[in-house]
Amino acid sequence: MKVRNSLKSLKNRHRDCRVIRRRGRTYVINKTNRRFKARQG
């Protein structure tokens, strides 16, 4: 999982990337290709 300040470029890496908020943190997850995971922080 990558930790980045800005998730805008990370959500454009793949067509299926979704931005999710969990427990006050923002994540990018991808169900089809799980290597595109990131957390903001």
Curated annotation (Swiss-Prot):
GO terms for biological process: translation. Pfam families: Ribosomal_L36. It comes from the Bacteria. One of its GO terms (molecular function) is structural constituent of ribosome. One of its GO terms (cellular component) is ribosome. Keywords: Ribonucleoprotein, Ribosomal protein. HAMAP family: Ribosomal_bL36. PANTHER family: 50S RIBOSOMAL PROTEIN L36 2 (PTHR47781), LARGE RIBOSOMAL SUBUNIT PROTEIN BL36B (PTHR47781:SF1). Belongs to the bacterial ribosomal protein bL36 family. This is Large ribosomal subunit protein bL36. It comes from Erythrobacter litoralis (strain HTCC2594).
